[in-house]
Amino acid sequence: MVAHPHPLFGGTLDNKVVQTIARAFVSQSIVVLRPNFRGVEKSTGAHDHGMGEVDDLWAAWKWLIEKFPGVRGKRWMGGFSFGAVMATHIAQQWSTHSIAAGQPGLDRVILVGLGIAPDRRPAADLGPTARLIHGELDEVVALKTVLDWAAPQRHPILVMPAAGHFFHGQLPFLKDCILRCLHD
């Protein structure tokens, strides 16, 4: 599953970073779903400031597991910007539910350009399966902001030199970084 950037700023399942994450997953023979959040393109509903969007992802996971029973093997979640923040909530809730049900959690969570902002729903704390990738020159969410957020959790961040928020001209390098994070 790969979650897209903020719907109110043009984020859709067709975003190039979302597609790059999805392609990295597909290259590892993982079934991938890139759903649009509510109110985006042909999706019903309206933006819900991160609350309903997490519900959207849960519904998509449920559909994916029912449609492709084999997905019960490896479960990878990815997200870009706002989608990465939503992915943190899925990962945290999945961990809580899976522990209670005696089921495995997500195998890997890839968070690219984590879109944390003081006026939005905060990102959830991360578990050990999460990997963060952030551009050194991110002009939307400063690297220092993400470092400050990750420090109390002692969570490492893979920093892509000279990369901005949208990784212009660096998608092949981003895909390589994602693949490294999937297998470290």
Regions found by a protein language model. Name each.
Residues M1-G70:
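Serine-hydrolase catalytic machinery in alpha/beta-hydrolase-like enzymes
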Residues R38, L158-G164:
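Short glycine-rich catalytic loops that host catalytic nucleophiles or stabilize transition states
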Residues E136-V141, H165-F166:
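Acidic catalytic loop of the alpha/beta-hydrolase fold
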Residues G78-A87:
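Gly/Ala-rich beta-loop-alpha elbow adjacent to hydrolase catalytic centers
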Residues G45, A163-K175:
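Catalytic histidine-centered segment of alpha/beta-hydrolase-like enzymes
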Residues L126-G127, R131-H134, D138:
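Short beta-strand/loop motif that positions the catalytic acidic residue
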Residues P128, V141-A150:
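Short alpha-helix in the alpha/beta-hydrolase fold that links the catalytic acid
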